[in-house]
Amino acid sequence: MSIFPIALALLLIGLEEGEAARDGYPLSKNNNCKIYCPDTDVCKDTCKNRASAPDGKCDGWNSCYCFKVPDHIPVWGDPGTKPCMT
């Protein structure tokens, strides 16, 4: 028995058309850096407005981290994004 069909099935479980998204740090409009996060409520609002993401939280370094960012929205570290200019 080949393991390929099993591996393919496991990869496809839970994926529906249009569901593609990833997690990441939204970019600041001013300098392409991660956005400062004073608290999780502010981050959740930032994620909704800047990254079209349904949820987010502050990470350990006071940066806003968003969940389920649509693929067409750039996040920090994406190929082709400009470097952070602090």
UniProtKB/Swiss-Prot annotation:
Q: In which tissues is it expressed?
A: Expressed by the venom gland.
Q: What domain of life does the native source organism fall in?
A: Eukaryota
GO CC annotations?
extracellular region
SUPFAM superfamilies, A to Z: Scorpion toxin-like
Q: Which region is the signal sequence?
A: 1-20
Give the main location. Answer: secreted
Give the subcellular location.
Answer: Secreted
The UniProt record lists the LCN-type CS-alpha/beta domain at 22-85
User: What Pfam families does the database record attribute to this sequence?
Assistant: Toxin_3
| UniProt cross-references to PROSITE patterns, sorted A to Z | LCN_CSAB
Which cysteines bridge via disulfide bonds? 33-84, 37-58, 43-64, 47-66
Spell out the Gene3D superfamilies in the cross-references: Knottin, scorpion toxin-like
Molecular function as annotated in GO: sodium channel inhibitor activity; toxin activity
**Membrane-spanning regions, if any?**
none
Give the family from UniProt: Belongs to the long (4 C-C) scorpion toxin superfamily. Sodium channel inhibitor family. Beta subfamily.
Q: What does this protein do?
A: Beta toxins bind voltage-independently at site-4 of sodium channels (Nav) and shift the voltage of activation toward more negative potentials thereby affecting sodium channel activation and promoting spontaneous and repetitive firing.
Q: What note about domains is in the entry?
A: Has the structural arrangement of an alpha-helix connected to antiparallel beta-sheets by disulfide bonds (CS-alpha/beta).
Q: Please report the name of this protein according to its UniProt entry.
A: Toxin Tpa6
